[in-house]
């Protein structure tokens, strides 16, 4: 690397150190289908080892959003990596796909090896939990694009599902049951509003809320639903699924419904984490609007036949996931979702 390039603000030695620090974390995520190692121009994955007859690839990309600002301000960088993976793999999971591999993109004002390592550790932890190989990535130092200490994180996930097992909305019918899987908290959406309310409240984020520091509550990583949902899919016919992200219930649940059908959701059938009550009170936000912004305690939904509902709840409980029968499917030409109890 030329001195001229270093004089322009790019610290190549810090980049080398970051790669060295992250390599042990990345190695933990490897699957037998991965061909070769790190450092190539392109990452390779052998689909023939999946033992699928007609595999369909499913891809998704996402970022963490302004939740990053809280992590940066308070120097807690590891959980953000979990968020980056969860936002991608939970999305592709809605098709019934098993996540196969993940690639990350980290852009920053200046490469700080210790910070990059923390981010990649979180990414790797989530990849290990979901059996997803971290097979590539990019760390870009762009001093003119970001303020000092700032960075952005995004990810890209690819999964596969047998063509005959692909989950869409084609089998959704009247009378089927909506099961909600509990969220771990706010997850990774609505943080522009969250940060506004934090600033207006003047709270000390080191102070306790519900027996935990506020900052830990706000940075609680997005829950990974891959293992429990794939375990459920092996035992029960799933008709449709939703990842409750930006837009809350109102924008996400209708995405899994065919025209002419609606989900009737009883909001009293599941507990709402206390942090949502705090946000609502702090911002004087209408309850309907809360359900149009946040997950309100339900991070993922599955639709099953009524006869399978009890069994599905039992399987999810065995997977250590809190789940609730939160509603049912009905015919409705005028709306795709009804919320009771708001």
Curated annotation (Swiss-Prot):
Organism superkingdom: Bacteria
Keyword terms of this UniProt record: ATP-binding, Cytoplasm, Ligase, Nucleotide-binding, Purine biosynthesis
Keyword Ribosomal protein in annotation: no
EC main group: ligase
Molecular function (Gene Ontology), one example: phosphoribosylformylglycinamidine cyclo-ligase activity
Any GO CC annotation of this UniProt entry: cytosol
InterPro entries to which the protein is assigned, alphabetical: PurM-like_C_dom, PurM-like_C_sf, PurM-like_N, PurM-like_N_sf, PurM_cligase
Pfam families registered for this protein in UniProt: AIRS (PF00586), AIRS_C (PF02769)
Catalytic reactions of this protein: 2-formamido-N(1)-(5-O-phospho-beta-D-ribosyl)acetamidine + ATP = 5-amino-1-(5-phospho-beta-D-ribosyl)imidazole + ADP + phosphate + H(+)
EC number(s) stated in the UniProt entry for this protein: 6.3.3.1
Subcellular location: Cytoplasm
Pathway info: Purine metabolism; IMP biosynthesis via de novo pathway; 5-amino-1-(5-phospho-D-ribosyl)imidazole from N(2)-formyl-N(1)-(5-phospho-D-ribosyl)glycinamide: step 2/2
Gene Ontology BP term (one): 'de novo' IMP biosynthetic process
Main location: cytoplasm
Disulfide bonds: none
Ligase found in the keyword field: yes
Family: Belongs to the AIR synthase family.
Protein name: Phosphoribosylformylglycinamidine cyclo-ligase
Species name: Staphylococcus aureus (strain MSSA476)
Protein's gene: purM
